């Protein structure tokens, strides 16, 4: 049977279309609809809070590992329940579409849609981990991302155009009904050949995924790689639109580059990346595509140097997003291989959250760096930010290894730790993470001041982080605290995985 002849594989790929629909609606279409309806821009800005469930889905994923619903098996029951909720919310949105002045109702529906969508994403990702065979991972990774992006393009792009010709009530009704065939796919999708044992307690479902993953050999290098592999791309893509506008391209040029050429290149690259990973091997694919996505940023440096030149800009955009797609296709295979089936929901949510973390943090960092260095030098710098990720790749997948093995038990670091000693080390990890993050942001702010003609001074940004006054400063401080807590928890989980926990306090 060929790689597309498996109903398992086709089910996973088709369900990814259901994942992409609500994302395009909440992220793109609803804000555009509100702006066209004349809603205050400050109110529209609050709609970004509706995106929060996708960022925090790790919080309720352990419950989905622990408590399967009574219908359709361990993960398909959660998928179907989420799709039923999305249909109901879509119909509700269609019902209030002729009353955009009911903005808070629309906001509440958008938030509920995001929560149902994030829950669906957790379940679909976990189902893919459990049901797919290893030889299907490459085709699945490429196909899933291609269908996901296509659905986002429909709900976040085509829907806006169609609403201009008809109405938002009609568009939202169509989007709600689009989940019905996806529900049929969910109902007919097969169960895994070997159903993994569910965690026996909620505590096991929360703690087990972290300790189980960190007990693997080279797990820390793998986690660092997950965070760093797409760092150069994240920094570049955070400011692509403002960069093109400042260079002098008009709105039509920017739209063609980002919406048409960019989407087509990204979808084609991801689809091809997944398929090539199957033939090249995961190790070689990560190496080749990693270098391509790093050096593709030099195309933007050329645009910054040359100025307004449409062919050069279009080529740079296609090369950068196409190579990004190749890397994403291989990376999707890596996530499927790394996730343990017993904790499929939580571990995949954890790894995918770590993967998206640099994208969330890249905007502020990229803005400060571009302001401090200028556009050309900023894009050259992004090439060097890709090197740490490749160094981590060399730690667990040397070039000579085509298919890496991840289920090797790591050596012990010593005798079991007492709880008090574990707490002290976790607090140390949190403080070190906080200091490192604060120092990096302060250096970037100081460099921005140098570019503006001021002396290099780390104290003002440090004082702003320690005693914030503005909304921006409070946001930065909150981000640093979240980063510190993550560092502390990661330190504790790693030590428990490698040394164990003594029953003595």
Give, region by region, the residue ranges found by the protein language model.
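Helix-to-loop junctions at the C-terminal end of transmembrane segments
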Residues: 56-73, 268-285, 370-371
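Symmetry-related core transmembrane helices of the 12-TM Major Facilitator Superfamily/SLC fold
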Residues: 81-87, 170-187, 377-395, 477-488
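C-terminal transmembrane helical hairpin of 12-TM major facilitator-type secondary transporters
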Residues: 284-331
């Amino acid at each position: 049977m060929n790689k597309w002849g498996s109903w398992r594989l086709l089910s996973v790929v088709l369900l990814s279309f259901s994942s992409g629909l609500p994302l395009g609606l909440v992220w793109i279409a609803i804000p555009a609809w509100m702006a066209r309806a004349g809603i205050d821009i400050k109110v529209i800005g609050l709609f970004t809070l509706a995106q929060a469930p996708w960022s925090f889905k790790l919080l309720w994923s352990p419950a989905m590992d622990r408590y399967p619903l009574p219908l359709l098996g361990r993960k398909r029951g959660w998928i179907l329940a989420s799709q039923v909720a999305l249909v109901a919310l879509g119909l509700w949105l269609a019902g209030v579409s002729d009353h955009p002045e009911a903005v808070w109702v629309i906001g509440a529906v958008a938030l509920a849609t995001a929560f149902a969508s994030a829950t669906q994403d957790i379940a679909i990702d976990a189902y893919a981990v459990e049901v797919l065979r290893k030889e299907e991972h490459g085709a699945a990774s490429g196909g899933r991302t291609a269908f996901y992006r296509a659905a986002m393009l429909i709900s976040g792009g085509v829907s806006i155009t169609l609403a201009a010709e008809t109405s938002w009530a009609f568009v939202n009704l169509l989007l709600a009904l689009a989940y019905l065939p996806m529900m049929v796919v969910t109902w007919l999708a097969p169960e895994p050949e070997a159903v993994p044992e569910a965690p026996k307690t909620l505590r096991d479902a929360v703690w087990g995924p972290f300790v189980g993953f960190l007990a693997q050999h080279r797990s820390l290098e793998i986690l660092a790689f997950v965070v760093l592999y797409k760092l150069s791309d994240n920094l570049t893509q955070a400011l692509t639109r403002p960069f093109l506008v400042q260079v002098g391209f008009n709105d039509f040029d920017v739209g063609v580059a980002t919406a048409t050429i960019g989407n087509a290149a990204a979808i084609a690259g991801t689809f091809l990346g997944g398929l090539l990973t199957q033939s090249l091997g995961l190790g070689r694919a990560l190496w080749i595509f990693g270098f391509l996505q790093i050096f593709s940023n030099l195309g933007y440096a050329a645009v910054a140097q040359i100025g307004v030149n449409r062919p050069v800009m279009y080529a740079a955009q296609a090369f950068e997003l196409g190579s990004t797609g190749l890397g994403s296709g291989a990376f999707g295979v890596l996530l499927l291989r790394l996730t343990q089936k017993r904790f499929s929901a939580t571990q995949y949510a954890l790894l995918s959250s770590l993967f998206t973390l640099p994208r969330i943090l890249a905007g502020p960092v990229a803005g400060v760096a571009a302001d401090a260095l200028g556009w050309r030098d900023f894009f050259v710098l992004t090439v060097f930010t890709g090197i740490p990720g490749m160094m981590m790749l060399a730690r667990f997948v040397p070039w000579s290894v085509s298919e890496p093995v991840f289920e090797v038990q790591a050596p012990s670091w010593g005798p079991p730790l007492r709880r008090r000693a574990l707490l002290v080390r976790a607090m140390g990890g949190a403080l070190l993470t906080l200091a490192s993050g604060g120092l990096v942001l302060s250096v970037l702010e100081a460099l921005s001041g140098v570019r503006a003609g001021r002396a290099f001074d780390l104290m003002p940004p440090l004082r702003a982080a320690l005693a914030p006054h503005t909304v921006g400063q409070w946001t930065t401080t909150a981000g640093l605290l979240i980063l510190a807590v993550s560092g502390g928890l990661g330190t504790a989980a790693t030590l428990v995985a490698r040394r164990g926990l003594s029953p003595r306090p």
